[in-house]
From Swiss-Prot:
Its main location: membrane. The keyword Membrane applies. It is a multi-pass membrane protein. This is Cysteine/O-acetylserine efflux protein. One of its GO terms (biological process) is cysteine export across plasma membrane. Exporter of O-acetylserine (OAS) and cysteine. It comes from the Bacteria. Disulfide bonds: none annotated. The chain crosses the membrane at residues 10-32, 47-67, 70-90, 105-125, 142-162, 177-194. Belongs to the Rht family. Keywords: Amino-acid transport, Cell inner membrane, Cell membrane, Membrane, Transmembrane, Transmembrane helix, Transport. The keyword Plastid does not apply.
Length: 195
């Protein structure tokens, strides 16, 4: 992977892992309402489910690459379009709602959430088909990057859980500006896929 593509990969994965989504909002809410210690079961369920979903995404993306390598080029364009759409949604979205507090959930509920979490499914397929498979189709790399994607996602969840009220205050005061900055960084990622 070239340094420019690697920088786009890291920018995309970190922004996606750290922006609001079902996992991050649930981690934030669980830690804010019940404390970090009580939210560990939720985080553990998310992490294991995230890993399983990333491995499933790897299987799907890898299978498509083996069936027809031209599909990977097409998926790169689809991935870039998705990143631009995500940038638009982030730039035009209001600041996070600090009053959203779901009831406490446990390990299995947060594990099961991963299989219907469109954000992480698109995150996995986009990252693999856009940044990895055009460079290599070595199965060990695809699996390794899938594990890395799950670790990056877990990092984002833990950050939101640890930050608790700090993130809520920051989004309340600077949410709009932060969304625009994150959106511009995602546009950078989409451009870097091809240049």
């Amino acid at each position: 992977m070239t340094p420019m593509l690697l920088s786009a990969f890291w920018t995309y994965t970190l922004i996606t892992a750290l922006t609001p989504g079902p996992n991050n909002i649930l981690a934030l809410s669980a830690a804010t309402a019940h404390g970090f210690r009580q939210s560990i079961r939720v985080l553990a369920g998310m992490s294991l489910g995230f890993l399983v979903v990333m491995l499933l995404c790897a299987g799907i993306a890898f299978s498509l690459a083996v069936i027809d390598p031209a599909i990977i080029h097409l998926l790169s364009w689809v991935g870039a379009a998705y990143i631009l759409w995500l940038a638009w949604k982030i730039a035009t979205s209001p600041a996070a709602d600090e009053n959203a507090r779901p009831k406490p959930v446990g390990f299995w509920v947060s594990f099961g959430l991963q299989f219907v979490n469109v954000k992480i499914i698109l995150y996995g397929i986009t990252a693999l088909s856009t940044f990895v498979l055009p460079q290599t189709q070595a199965l060990n790399w695809v699996i390794g990057v899938s594990i890395l994607l799950a670790l990056i996602g877990t990092f984002g969840n833990v950050c939101w859980a640890l930050a608790g009220h700090l993130f809520q205050r920051a989004f309340r005061h600077y949410g709009r500006q932060l969304n625009i900055i994150l959106a511009l960084l995602l546009v950078y990622c989409a451009v870097r896929i091809f240049y």
